[in-house]
Amino acid sequence: MEQAHSLLLNEEACSQLPEHQRAEFVFEWLRFLKKLLPATDRADVKQKQKRLVEQLTTVLTSSPGPPTRLLLAQCLALVYRVGDSLTSSLTVDRCNDIIRSKDDSPSFLPTRLAAVACLGALYEQLGRLLINSFKETTTNLLKAMRSAESQGRCEIMLCVERILRGLGVSAVSCHRDIYKAARTGLTDRSMAVRCAAAKCLLELQREAVFLWSTELDNVATLCFRALEGSNYDVRVSISKLLGTLLASALEPRQAIAPRPGSKRSSLEEVMELLSSGFLRGGAGFLRASGDMLKGTSSVSRDVRVGITQTCVVFVSILGGVWLETHFSRLLSLLMEWASHTRATQYPADAVSCRCCVSFILRATLGTLLGEKAQIAAAKEICQVISKQKRVVDASLHEGNMETRVSPADVAASQHVLVCALLELGSLVQDLSSTAAPLLQDTGIGMLDTVISVLLHPSASARLASAWCLRCIAVGMPAQVAVLLDRCVERLNALKSCPEAVAGYSAAIAALLGAVQLSPLGISHSKGKMVMTLAEDLLRSAAQNSRISIQRTQGGWLLLGALSTLGPTVMEHHLPRLLLLWKCAFPLSVKDVEMELRRGDSFTWQVTLEGRAGALCAIKSLVVHCKELLTDDVICRFVPLLSCAVALLTQLPSIIKSYGNQIKNAATVFKLRLYEILKLLQPKIYEESFGTVLKQLLNDLTGPEITACAERNLLPSLCYSQDLALLGPGLQDMDQRYIEEQLHGGGSGGGTLEYDSFTIFEKSQEVLEQFCEFVRQLKGARQQTVQIHVTAAFFCTLKSLASSRRELGPEEVQRPALSLLLGALEGSNPLLRCMAAEGLARLVQVLIDPGFTVSLTLMSFDKLKTARDAITRTGHALALGTVYRYLGGISSPQYLSACVGVLFTLSQDNTSPEVQMWALHALSTVVDLAGPLYHSHLEASFTLVLRLLLSTPHTHVEVQQSLGRCLNALITSVGPDLQGEGPGVCAVRTSCLVGCAVMQDSQDCLVQALAISCLQQLHMFAPRFVNLSSLVPSLCINLCSSYLSLRRAVVACLRQLAQREAVEVSEHAVALVKELPRRDNTQLDVTIKEVGLEGALFSLLDRESDPRLCRDIQETLVHMMSSAAESKLAHWLKLCKDVLSASADSAAAASVETQQEEDGDRYDDSSAFHAKSESSGPFNNLRWSTRVFSMECVCRIIAQCENRDSAHFNMALAQEQRLHESTDFLVLHLADLIRMAFMASTDHSDQLRLAGLQTLLVIIRKFSNVPEPEFPGHVILEQYQANVGAALRPAFHVDAPPNVTAKACQVCSAWIASGVISDLRDLRRVHQLLASSLAKVQVGRDVPSQLYNESTFTMESLAVLKAWAEVYITAVQGSRQRDSPVSHQQQQSEEAGTAGQAGAGLLKLVQTDLATLSRLWLAALQDHALLTLPPHYSSHLPSTGGSFYTAETVEQARPHYYSAWATILHATALWLNSTGFIVVDEGPANLSRPVTPTSMGQSTSLSNVKSPEDINSDRLHLILGISVEFLCSPHSGDQMENIHSCLQALQALLEVPWPRSKVGNDQALSVELLSILHRLIVTRESPSIQLAVLELVQQIICAAQEHVREKRHSAEVDDGAAEKETVPEFGEGRDTGGLVPGRSLVFGALELCLCTLVRKLPQLSPKLTGSPTGRGGQTCSLSATDCRLVTSALAILSELPSICSPEGSVSVLPTVLYLLLGVLKEAVKGSVGTESGQLVSGILQALRTLLTSPMSRAEKSRGAWTQLLQCALHTLLESWSTDKVEPGVDEVTMLTSLTIFLLYASAEVTSVEPLQTRCIQTFRASLDSKDPVVLSRSYQLLLSLFQGPAPVARPFILALGGRLVSQLEEAEKSRPQGPAELQAVQDAIRALEALVFAADETHRPQLVAVLLPILISLLLDENALASAPAASRSLHESALRDLMRIGPQHSAVLKALMASAPHMKARLEAAVKGNQESVNSKAQAPPAISKNTPSIQLKINFL
């Protein structure tokens, strides 16, 4: 195929190819030529033009296929347009000659069609250059059309359309002739010709003014005739044509020359034209008159559907502005349609007409108008409703009761009211909370108007009114309670009026049904009210026969609707409901038989209505409250069902006895019974099987069943993909609502067949009876029965397959197969589809390979012998579906046979239907065969491509099947498409050629399949799909009028956006720039302005299909993920434009900050003001689209968080912006705040929630970003007023609870962020929370509860959580300010308002703390109760808790779960601040009891609790909640909750009283440790692990205090001084044993060991000994890891102190092993760079351990001494065996050794050889060459010399001389650096300590040694001047020491001076020099101080 890519056709390569590949080669060449010609130089084209034209002409005359001829025509026209156009007339003449040819043979037809196509393309491209031959060509074409077959007529019409497009106004001379030909084409028998003629006329009307002026009536009549018997495509084309003409007539695009008597059409005239077709159709005068006389309607439904679509097109073209202006008149005219007697003679016609009018209103108002215009339209509709209601009311009150209203008036008004009310409901539901102005407009009185219709005499109008109220309730949940109260009140007042009972009960039921769609619900009291009302209606039904039926129906309707509120409501009413059901049915089956002997037709009608209602209520309970269906309740059902089944068998005799007036009631009863039986388990009514089966057989096959709505019944039973065989009528489409009217048919039994039943032992008889019924009947009745019984059996098979049960023995299989095969060969295509699916289910149920094989062989035989299309289509589909549920095709033999048969059938050109079904079956086989199909791929691709290139465009159904087949083949090849082999390249080329053929198709479904195939190709081989051609084709179809095509386009875009979002967007913009201006749509303009993403936002706003909207949103998210950072400003502006594109939103403005000079008068509400902003790419977007834009903003912020840190750093962003052309989020903070404000203050509640969420995200992400220009400030400070203004509306009294709850969350985050710097700002925000707190105190017992009680829970807990967060922040801030570090910082910084705000926050909270603390405790108590296991549910308070009611337990749980942790932390902090001192604050700040028990503060005298009890309750409440949560096995718990729990426990244990309680209760302490141990194992978060260890330290501290107190008490009480022994306390007692699971010490050991081993696995003997373990590895520890290890060691060091002496001996070896093990790792340097922090912790732990009182206790002293000696030995051994690193490691070892020597008892260190080795270690350290080690050694010796005499003496004796000699050497080698200087100074101090450690008697001798050394370190005057800095420092230090020590020992000094004159001279010289230096400094003039300016300039201007 690569050889086809040239300017001229490679004829040699082409001739060598086989015949079937030649066409593909030519097509590929033409494809390439089409792309190449526009890019080729004109001269090159001219040079080769002659040869090129010859080649193209050769292709033209070689019978090209439809796709080839289309490409050929385009290429031929391009050649003349790009090259020389002079010879084009020759080609035109040649084409005309071909068209004139007399050759009528089928082989010449493709050439003639190609010539026609070429003419169209030539004239379209060259236009007026061919004007000379135009008339001749047109005449020739129109003449040929008369004798042409359907393909020719279609092609000629399309050719003429292109000619008109090319010539424009120049073609005016032939307009009339073309019009005449197109008129004929409009009513052609071929649907494709009708479509082509409509397109031709659509192009003609651009210049032919007469079409929409003088000829408008005739064209309209012609269009009406064209709609008769039309298909979907024709209706779309005709509606587009006629709608355009009517719009042109009303709003002409060009001026019409004035003619006598002519005038511009008015809206009334245009609608009258449509009305004539709508009411009379396309019939002539005589036929219409005859219909009028006969009283029948001749208007077919397809005409009405077509006119409906025309009306939508007409209004859409005129646009939203026109509609807004003229809606009142349009509405009036549409209502005339709905109420016209011609359209409403029969009920079915009336329903169809109403649907059409409703569709027009929905398709125009719902898509063209913005929210403000929709509100205006709703007001107009309200006026229409009021007008109609007034007419009916007037007729009701005139005259007597007999003549109160004519049926015609009621009928006319009811249809108008139904249409108006349904549209009003849809508008309000779409507008949601933005419809609030409608309710507030008292002039309209919308609610009064709608409710008034509930009294209408017509049931349809009443139900429409009820539905409208339901829509209002869904859109505005706040109205549910109000409307319910109002309807109940009116119903109680008008119980004697039948219409009122029926209307208001329907309204109440509708409102109850709306509650499940509202997240806020209604109060449970409303349920009780409705239950009482329903009981009252049912009990009073028999009191007045005139309204018995209405009360009965109303009562049961209310009970059925009540069940939709769910089990939490119904469980309270179930006993009463069961009693009502019992009363509705006889007590037994015998009573049913007795009933038959009494009553009349009226009583039976009431009885049947009542029982049908009861069954409906049972069904509603089963559907909505499955949890309540206990065995007991089901047992109560069984007698009722038995009676109902018994009555079922008696219905025929009852109807026979009392007439047909009760037939409807009997049918409804039967339906309700079948519905409930279908929902229940069959075992429940097992005794009634026989009766039910007989009745079902009769209902499915009975003689009264004459019609069947198979279009409603069968599609749901067919396989979804098989429905594609049945055309676009069963596909999803925009017009589905009215298109379904065409398939309604009769309703005889069509609603009963969905009831599946299970066949047991009577299966064989039932199936045989089914087959017999089908055999006996003929004609339409046979088909009806066949559909019913086959559908019933199919449902059985499906049920058996889903439950994995068997059908039965072979006797059952035979009739089953017979039944399905009969349906497979039926004339109804839907039935055949369902039968094929039924065979697949039968094979699945039987699981018999032999049966499957025999079934396929039978189909093969049938296909070989049968010649009729019906049989062949059915069995072809069966071949494809048989293996559908068996895991696919696994037999190569079956696959080969199947492929061979289907290949043959798919090439049967005589029957397009057989081709279509065979190809669809082949696609199914490809899917099911999987890799097994690979051997057939090449042949399949060849077949599909050949058929695609040869199938006429009129056979679109075959093209659709080919598309599905190609898609399956691409999927089968899969990732292999990426290969480079010759075979793969050929397959890939075939795929691309096939897709190109389908893309050029005129059919939208074929185009959609082409896009789907390209999407598959892109998934498997993305680099071979050319985006530059694919994306433009997608964008062109983005606004297609076909839903399936739009879905395919967006699905493909979604996939492309995941990989190449930027390229896709660029290609889209490039396409729009290249488009001719004539084709520009609003979408193109949008793409040009804001890119493809902006167009997708526009499309999202217009679309109503959920699947398509979801795909659009995902596409936008993918595009944003790829490009949001690189095009940040673009995306943010796009979101801002979308958000502000609302005509009526208060936020649709540019928002500017207004700051007043007077701070006291400053108010948040003035922070923003709106300025009109009309410009922008979007207009009137809906709230849902704007909500999505805010979600996009949040996504952008989240994306930036994971990218460059400069996004959240203003200084860094500004710096990088100077060097790079990058953008950062922080630079757009003003826009983010502005958008959040706009959304937060919108009318739409959903948008307000989205805005508040965005504001919350902004606060969390930007609160810590500093402001570079104002150090010490953050960037958000400048937006304080803006945030306050955004929050304020959410705290309004009328704000919904969910909005207020979200605002509380934002409020607390704002306060806690620390941004607020001014105390006044802080007070303003605090006041918002204070107002909410007051609302919480009022409580849930308010009389007008609008929402469910759980909303009070949500709001209350949100408020309490917000206050808790604020309090936590305030306390933490206060603690930080009180810390010493913070004090220093505050003193060093200037005092500012930030400090005032921080200090003021705690004061503000403390004013409400008394109230808050009680509320917090109450909320925690509620939470504790709700977390009890289910078997404790009986312990829950019957009235509920403080913030929830008993009925809303389940709804309340999530709200408690989201808030409890923060409240727990705050409560613990409050208790910490009070020190658990109970203060009686009094109830002054609390307006209601907080909780049933008030947490121990009840004022009842009998229940007064002591402060101790109250504290105990509070402590155990917090402990219990914390322990329960931390024990939870769920790993998904939020880390914040765990942190809050741990911090709460820490806050508690900081207070002595709770610490003593925990210390006293060892079981509790052990349990806590066990939980903390599991937590540290399961959570990897370092912060959690650190918090755990801190908490363990507090628990150990509590135990220490307890043990200390016990010991002290024992000593005092028992008189320890007088007794030899004192009882021992602590773990281990007398034995020293520690019991796992009961021992606190053991638990702490486990926890610490776990922590240490995880960080230092070398400590574990098992891991160290393991050859593959981590023992040998060295792991570097982070700073956090070091903190964890240090904390664990600190805990370990404290453990012996809580043991008895014996217990301490048990635990000491482990503690020492771990401590020394960590020390060893630290000394080895294996812990990394953070070892300094760890070493200090180790040494502190060692010191704590050595100073433990247990080391000196009498009972343990000996053991401790031995163990410590062993430890010291180990330490010394590691010194000698391990390679000690120089520097800090050696120092660490020396330090630890010193701690041992100083703090262990002398018994430990004085034994040999330990003492000697210690001395040797120090002696070795004194020989070190490292001055740091020397310095530290001297410091440690200083400590030792100052230590106890037994410790110091040996070291003084052993090392004193060494010390002196080293100091004497210092004179010779003076220090050269700071380290050496420090070592000498430390040595001097050590020697000084040695001197002063000596006895008084020996001290002078030692001073006599020290003083010469100091004097020797002095320098003379000359040496001092030139000496290094270290030497001078040593000189000065030595002199100071001499002047300090000398006077203390003057005698020694004098003796020394006398004996050593040279020393005396040196000393005197040094003193003299020092004195002179001091004097010179004192006489020096003071330096002039240079004041630093207070304001620093950033630029030095000097």
Curated annotation (Swiss-Prot):
Keyword set includes tRNA processing: no
Domain of life (superkingdom): Eukaryota
Biased composition (Basic and acidic residues): 1162-1172
Region (Disordered): 1149-1176, 1608-1630
Family named by the database record: Belongs to the HEATR5 family.
Entry keyword set: Repeat
Name listed for the protein in its UniProt record: HEAT repeat-containing protein 5A
SUPFAM superfamilies: ARM repeat
Repeat region (HEAT), residues: 811-848, 1025-1062
Annotated GO biological process: endocytosis; protein localization; retrograde transport, endosome to Golgi
Pfam families found in the cross-reference section: HEAT_HEATR5A, Laa1_Sip1_HTR5
Any single Gene Ontology cellular-component annotation: cytosol
InterPro entries documented for this protein: ARM-like, ARM-type_fold, Laa1/Sip1/HEATR5, Laa1/Sip1/HEATR5-like_HEAT
